[in-house]
Structures are given as structure tokens and as C-alpha cells.
Regions:
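Bacterial N-terminal signal peptides that target proteins for export
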Residues: 1-9
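Extracellular/periplasmic catalytic domains that process cell-envelope and extracellular macromolecules
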Residues: 26-29, 61-62, 83-84, 97-100, ...
Length: 304
């Protein structure tokens, strides 16, 4: 059984910095999965990448992540995460033609999981061509997936991690179509347990209304909602926000732009209905009083 306990100092720090505390204990067989846009190296001072990556790792440790997907991570950032998180292995590659640049890596605790196979493909009309993109997309976009086997329970699941385009709504829609057609639907047809995480650069509507998100799980999709990649993925998977057995913790919205007050919910964790979601949280941590990224990570504790 994996147990996570917070000491007195950690509790004091949590109160001081207004963060969402980690669960006191995980039941045998449960694990914590998360999505974290770690922000590319585009800032200076306290927000510089080499200052922020240790904070990212601190969030991972504080909340007991067992497996998580990152977005925007470049090789220099990954190198720090590797040093800070020696118990973790990762799979995936960069999005550019030379497989460099920003990556959508999947990190997993090597003591907890075996990676049986993995792949990165491009969200384009030619998914096997590195660096390819849809017309109108601001940059190449990818999906990395891994078939993981839990060393505790022996159960397997397929984990997809992605980052949709920030410029073109059409590219976001098309990209999700590729991801579902190439990855999710075949895995579902085989009866596999699936997780999909990522920064989708999209909300259901401009109001960013939780009730509207919840409506995706019923028969009330409108034609306008069907044009949204969130609605599209929700035809295949469920938003874990609405699956949690306990109330959501932390802010509903996830992107805060280093301001601390998030403006929209664009970071998601989806899963197949067989997943037992124990908790769902947006982690509003500020390790040492400083931001780790311009996005707050989202984490779920689950059982299979």
C-alpha cells in the first residue's frame, strides 16, 4: 500500500500558501494521476524555467503523483525534472520535425508501473510524419500514449496525453478527431481502461459554466456544443470532474497566467466509465510562495 502523510510543517505551509492539500492516505491499489502544463521557457526572474522546474517537482512530490502528463516541456526543463524525480521514467518526444522542442511526455513511477509500449503521433492529416500540422494551426501538435501495467494490481490502462492548438479552433477539432480515431476508439473497442489528459485550449462555452460541462454527460448536446473538442471527446470518455465520489477541491478554473486567479478551465482529465474516481482537485500550490507554472495542475486519485 502506498501511503502519503503530511507532517506539521507541510500543513502549515499549505495554509500559508493557500494550496490544496494532498490526501492523507491512498487505499491499496489506488493511484494519483495528473495533468500539468509546465510552461515553456519564456519568462525571466523568479518565473524563469530553471527556477520553476524544481517547484513543479515539489508539487509532484507533495501530492504523491504516481503518473502524470506534462505539456510544453522542452529538453532543458525535462533534464531538471529527471534530476528532481529520480523514481520516475518518461516516454514521448518533441513535436518538431526533428522530434525536439515542446513535448507531451508521460512520467510514471517506475516502482509502481511497467510501460509495455508507447507512441507519439502528430495531430495532422499525416500523424506519422514528425512536425506535421493542420492548416491554420499555430504549431505542430502531438499526442503521446503509453500502455501501463500496475505492478501492485497487475491491471493495465492506456494513457493519452495531448496539447491542442492555441490558435485555430478548427485545428483543435481536427486534432481531437485524429486522437480519437487513431487512439481512443480502437482502445475502447478492445475493452481497455483509458485516461486522456491535456491542455485542450478550449472551454465548453465562453461562460465556462460547470453546469454546461456536466450537461455533456447527458443527451442534451446542442449543435454548437458538438463543434467543441471537449464535447467531441465526451462522446467517448467521461470528464473525471463529474465522476468523483467526493467534491472537487481547489478552483474550478485552471489557467491563471502567473496571476493566481484562474480565468478559464482548459486542463482536463478524461477516463472510461469503469474508472473509480475517488477525488478530483485543481492544485493551487505556490511552493515557497512562488508559482510553478501559469497553469494549475489537475489531479485525480483513482482505482481500477
Amino acid at each position: 500500500m502506498i501511503k502519503i502523510r503530511m507532517g506539521v510543517a507541510a500543513v502549515i505551509a499549505a495554509v500559508a500558501f493557500g494550496c490544496v492539500t494532498a490526501p492523507g492516505e491512498k487505499a491499496a491499489g489506488d493511484f494519483t494521476l495528473a495533468t500539468f502544463n509546465v510552461r515553456c521557457p519564456a519568462d525571466k526572474g523568479e518565473l524563469a524555467w530553471y527556477r520553476r522546474m524544481p517547484r513543479v517537482a515539489q508539487v509532484v512530490r507533495d501530492h504523491g503523483f504516481d503518473v502524470f502528463g506534462v505539456q510544453e516541456a522542452v529538453p532543458s526543463e525535462v533534464k531538471i525534472l529527471e534530476a528532481e524525480l529520480p523514481d520516475f521514467a518518461h516516454v514521448g518526444c518533441g513535436r518538431e520535425a526533428d522530434r525536439g522542442g515542446e513535448s507531451m511526455l508521460i512520467f510514471y513511477n517506475r516502482d509502481r508501473f511497467n510501460c509495455l509500449t508507447n507512441e507519439t503521433f502528430w495531430l495532422s492529416e499525416t500523424p506519422d510524419r514528425p512536425g506535421s500540422r493542420y492548416t491554420g494551426a499555430g504549431c505542430p501538435r502531438t499526442c503521446t500514449w503509453a500502455l501501463l501495467e500496475d505492478r501492485v494490481t497487475g491491471k493495465r490502462f492506456r494513457y493519452f496525453n495531448t496539447h491542442l492548438d492555441h490558435i485555430s479552433s478548427k485545428a483543435r477539432w481536427n486534432g481531437m478527431q485524429v486522437l480519437l480515431e487513431r487512439g481512443v476508439r480502437p482502445a475502447k473497442a478492445r475493452g481497455e481502461t483509458i485516461f486522456l489528459t491535456g491542455d485542450l485550449n478550449e472551454t465548453l462555452d465562453k461562460a465556462d459554466d460547470p453546469a454546461a460541462i456536466a450537461a455533456l454527460h447527458g443527451p442534451r448536446l446542442t449543435e454548437s456544443a458538438k463543434e467543441n473538442p471537449i464535447a467531441l471527446v465526451s462522446t467517448e470518455l467521461k470528464d473525471t470532474y463529474g465522476m468523483s465520489a467526493t467534491p472537487h477541491r481547489g478552483t474550478y478554473k485552471t489557467f491563471h497566467g502567473f496571476k493566481g486567479t484562474p480565468s478559464c478551465r482548459i486542463d482536463y482529465i478524461f477516463a472510461t466509465p469503469d474508472v473509480k474516481v475517488r477525488s478530483h482537485a485543481t492544485l493551487n500550490d505556490k511552493p515557497g510562495g512562488q508559482f510553478a507554472s501559469d497553469h494549475y495542475p489537475v489531479a485525480v486519485t483513482v482505482g481500477l
